[in-house]
Amino acid sequence: MGGIVDAAVGLYQGAKKVVSATKAFKFLKGAGINPWVALAVFAIGWLYFSTRKPESPDFGDSDFNNFEKGILLNHQSNDMSIPVVYGIRKVGGTRVFVETSGTDNEFLYIGLVLCEGEIESVDKIYVDDKEVTWSGALADDTLRTVDSSDGNFYKDSASLISVKCHYGTDAQAQCDLLGTLSSWTSNHRLRGLAYISLKMKWNQDAFSSLPTITALIKGKKVVAYDGSSVAQTAAHSDNPAWCLLDYLTNERYGKGIPIANIDIPSFYTASGVCDTDVTAYGATTIDVLDCNAVIDTSRK
């Protein structure tokens, strides 16, 4: 990894001699480097120099604040902890797969893990903060392309992005969108993880930098219980009682407490309190408490 960064920094230094950021990128692209790689090189170089600042005093910013700031970012890692999302949240993700293909490397493939699964749905996807209008509703393991009404990512009578969402079941199959590449095999299933796979066609008017992808999702399906302490089918919920119960009992990302050791009637009572309707401003009726949280699993 160090060699890649060193090379990127070196190329960036050479490019910056042409003064502006835009000209620097054009310099890299004109040097015979494929556009996606040029963007990556420029991003790494810029990050390297922009972060080389004098050390400042530590005023005690909490880990929580740092985690909150990173929720909408795109990270690049193969060992980063995966968050749990309860309720409805807009999140970034972790790029676990990036590769180019095509005669001139004009296609960029990305596998972006959002959170632990299984989730209810991916409702919206944004590229560089622009909402993408798709050819149909986003659904699990369903291919979508950009609709012709989208002015940002539909160019020259063609979609620039193809996407497949994967909601993170434990029986999740290989993504055939990424599976067109030999490096994404039938063993790459990302079971139990909610992720989106994308294929992007290079267009200098649509992509001014390495794209940042975010998604509005309905998060983790959780198990609720009825008044007789009978478990219900796992479903999306923003009720804090059932979200807490899921975290306490989950063995993969939570505390792994056996359900037999949990006072289920107390959670049922608490869930009813949370679902109590109250009148907000404008006479709108809302629950007294909802949970729309992103949980940092590295602090388990």
State each model region's role.
Residues 2-15, 29-300:
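Polar, S/T/G-rich
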